[in-house]
Regions:
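Alpha-helical transmembrane segments and their helix-start/interface "positive-inside/aromatic belt" motifs
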Residues: 31-42, 163-173, 370-375, 452-460
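Hydrophobic alpha-helical membrane-insertion segments
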Residues: 39-54, 172-183, 377-384, 420, ...
Length: 514
């Protein structure tokens, strides 16, 4: 079992990479690339399930850890591991990959080899971001995640893919240059890219305060653009409008939010505390701004983009509230957001494929024709707006309660107003698409309800929303080990003179109200 535990993260990284290479060399006939990609994604998902099955809740620090020298100069290590912060995010990424492939099964008809190879490469990069504990290794995966996504948007966009891809690439790539400079500065000062080592040296070292502020700002800028945090959201609506459904449902928000928690707060707690009031204010503006713009959208892709801005801003508020309970709620809501958005994007993609428009006023009265589609769309909508007994309620309740007791009652009231507006625009979307009189478009086309294969993909997502709402302790038990500071423990996979700290084991943080 120890051999499996020591190699499981490497397998999770290598299997989708090998699948991408196999898709690239396979003949493009009889949907062979589709089947190779699906089999690869299912195997990878199965590997990710090993992590929660063998995760030790009472053990602090990183688990399934591997730390091996890779490049001697500069000293870059193959250092990977997971803790409660990243555990469920790895599983979520594994779950969404086969769902994304099924969602693309009949919509990607040309250059399928390119699509599925790049999609699996994107998955490799996402897994790498979540498990990397060497900052240069992390940076490599971070940059790798940008390239396949930009190419996929450019090649498979709906109307103006190249322009949306260029905007996405410039917005997200340019801030990565200061991040690289910051990493090199840290290496010049410490001789290490290792996250655990840097965490200790920064907290106990004698660095220039002004230089460290600039380094922390470079980290924050790269992550804030990727979330995105208001007002750095200029790429979001075009990307959601043009990105293939599989891509939009897989990547929305998770990488930037995780990186904020792991690397910005985890490495620079003092600097994070200094900028927290500003980020809290921007997050609340983003919650309300996104919700108000979502209310007036006529295009459902753009509505989903601004809804995402509002919901991701709520998670940002929880992160920079700097309370342990807020961090629990943030990670939980990232998971819920990933599940709910996957269901909504998949269902909206099916509607778009049938009716060839994303204009909301072109729809109407579809509940009678597409009852299964309508039912699952309503369930996903209720999950997004936070109905009790669904996962969205748990995440929003934890976030708002932690903000109320640990940050500001005024900010909490403003954030709660954004949540209420979220219910308004999502329920209005349901009403306009599925209820009321039929539009000329929907009346002229029979419409196809979900077939058994699509139901088999969507039903587990609906069940997962319910399980997350009814049994939150199952998920929170692992999350808490990643955000609560346990006693320091010696890592078996780290150098003998390095102590493993979980990402949140920072004495200057986590002192706010629980």
């Amino acid at each position: 079992m120890n051999e499996i535990n020591n190699s499981i993260l490497t397998l999770i990284l290598l299997v989708p990479l090998a699948g991408a290479l196999l898709v690239a060399i396979a003949p493009d006939r009889a949907k062979l690339p589709n089947w190779i990609a699906l089999l690869t994604a299912l195997v990878t998902f199965g590997l990710t399930l090993h992590l929660p099955a063998h995760f030790v809740l009472g053990q602090g620090g990183f688990q399934f850890e591997v730390n091996r020298p890779w490049i001697e100069s500069p000293a870059i290590h193959y250092h990977v591991g997971v803790d409660g912060l990243s555990l469920w995010l790895v599983v979520l990424a594994g779950l969404l990959a086969p769902i994304g492939i099924v969602a693309s099964w009949n919509t990607i008809k040309e250059r399928r080899k390119v699509f599925y190879a790049l999609f699996l490469l994107q998955q490799t990069a996402m897994f790498g971001v979540f498990v990397s504990l060497d900052l240069m290794l992390y940076y490599g995966f971070w940059e790798l995640s940008l390239v396949p996504m930009a190419i996929l948007i450019a090649m498979y966009g709906r109307k103006d893919g190249p322009r949306a891809a260029l905007k996405f690439f410039l917005f997200t790539f340019i801030p990565s240059a200061p991040l690289l400079v910051a990493l090199l500065w840290l290496y010049a000062q410490t001789g290490s890219f290792d996250f655990v080592t840097l965490q200790i040296l920064i907290s106990h070292g004698s660095f220039s305060a002004s230089a460290l502020c600039w380094v922390a700002l470079a980290f924050l800028l790269a992550f804030a653009v990727k979330v995105p945090v208001f007002p750095l959201h200029g790429w979001l609506s075009d990307t959601f409008s043009e990105a293939p459904v599989a891509l939009a449902m897989v990547v929305a928000g998770k990488l930037g939010l995780y990186s904020m928690l792991r690397f910005h707060i985890g490495l620079f707690p003092v600097q994070a505390r200094a900028v927290a009031p500003t980020l809290i204010g921007l997050a609340v503006i983003g919650i309300l701004y996104g919700a108000c713009l979502a209310l007036v959208q006529r295009d459902f892709w753009r509505l989903m983009a601004f809804a995402a801005l509002s919901h991701l801003s709520l998670i940002t508020l929880a992160i920079y509230g700097l309370t342990l309970t807020g961090w629990e709620g943030a990670v939980y809501q990232i998971l819920n957001h990933g599940v709910v958005d996957a269901a909504l994007f998949l269902l909206l993609g099916l509607l778009y494929d049938q009716y060839s428009t994303s204009q909301i006023n072109a729809y109407g009265g579809l509940a009678a024709k597409l009852p299964n589609t309508a039912t699952l769309f309503v369930i996903a909508t209720l999950g997004m707006i936070g109905l009790p007994m669904l996962g969205g309620f748990v995440g929003e309740f934890i976030i708002l309660s932690s903000t109320f007791t640990g940050v500001s009652r005024s900010w909490t009231i403003a954030a709660a107003l954004g949540v209420i507006l979220g219910a308004a625009y999502m329920l209005w979307l349901v009403q306009r698409i599925f209820y009321g009189p039929e539009s000329p478009l929907t009346a002229s086309r029979p419409g196809n309800d979900l077939h058994p294969g699509q139901l088999a993909v969507l039903a587990p997502l609906a069940v997962l929303m319910l399980v997350m709402g009814l049994a939150p302790s199952f998920w929170l038990a692992a999350i808490q080990t990643g955000v609560h500071p346990p006693p320091l423990k010696q890592s078996q996979a780290s150098p003998a003179n390095v102590l493993v700290l979980p990402s949140m084991s920072i004495p200057s943080l986590g002192e706010g109200p629980r």
